[in-house]
């Protein structure tokens, strides 16, 4: 039985790259993963239900197979969303956590705003929405 479970776990982990990036919502957890896996963190500030450039960035970059595959292997992705519609409301705890992230990394309230961090949370780059290909956006993040 243990052998079957171990085999299943190995199979699931090998499909991780095919499934796409996994979005974190907690910076401490993202930093821990980034430290263990030696990856930079991509912190995305967005208004998923009201910010037109945020929606374009999701559709044209984050949701593409090219970016999903690359990011799952090379980045730890964290999302700080600020939705306005009631149906998309976040928990109070997540809203507070996102506000703290904005205080630390997005003081000017820019949307979308993409911050590249090292595994300790130090800013190593910033960008926003650009009409470009996923490949070129990846080059900019790197």
Where are the regions a protein language model picked out?
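Typically the conserved alpha-helix immediately C-terminal to a functionally engaged Cys/Sec
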Residues: 54-72
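A short beta-strand-turn-helix
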Residues: 24-41, 71
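Short active-site neighborhood of thiol/selenol oxidoreductases, capturing the structured segment around
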Residues: 37-51
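Thiol-based oxidoreductase modules, predominantly thioredoxin-like and allied folds used
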Residues: 22-24, 67-96
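Bacterial Sec-dependent N-terminal signal peptides
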Residues: 1-22
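The canonical Cys-X-X-Cys-His
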Residues: 51-54, 114
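Hydrophobic beta-strand anchors of alpha/beta hydrolase catalytic cores
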Residues: 42-43, 77, 114
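Non-catalytic, surface beta->alpha helical segment in thiol-disulfide oxidoreductase systems
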Residues: 97, 103-104, 108-142
């Amino acid at each position: 039985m243990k052998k079957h479970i171990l085999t299943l776990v190995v199979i699931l982990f090998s499909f991780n790259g095919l499934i796409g990036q996994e979005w974190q919502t907690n910076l401490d957890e993202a930093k821990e993963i980034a430290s263990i896996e030696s990856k930079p963190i991509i912190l995305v500030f967005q208004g998923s239900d009201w910010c037109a450039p945020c929606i374009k960035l999701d559709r044209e970059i984050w949701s593409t197979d090219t970016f999903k595959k690359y990011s799952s292997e090379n980045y730890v992705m964290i999302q700080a969303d600020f939705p306005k519609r009631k149906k998309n409301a976040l928990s109070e705890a997540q809203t507070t956590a996102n506000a703290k992230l904005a205080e630390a990394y997005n003081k000017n309230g820019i949307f979308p705003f993409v911050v590249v961090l090292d595994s300790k949370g130090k800013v190593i780059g910033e960008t926003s929405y650009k009409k470009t290909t996923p490949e070129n956006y990846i080059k900019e993040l790197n």
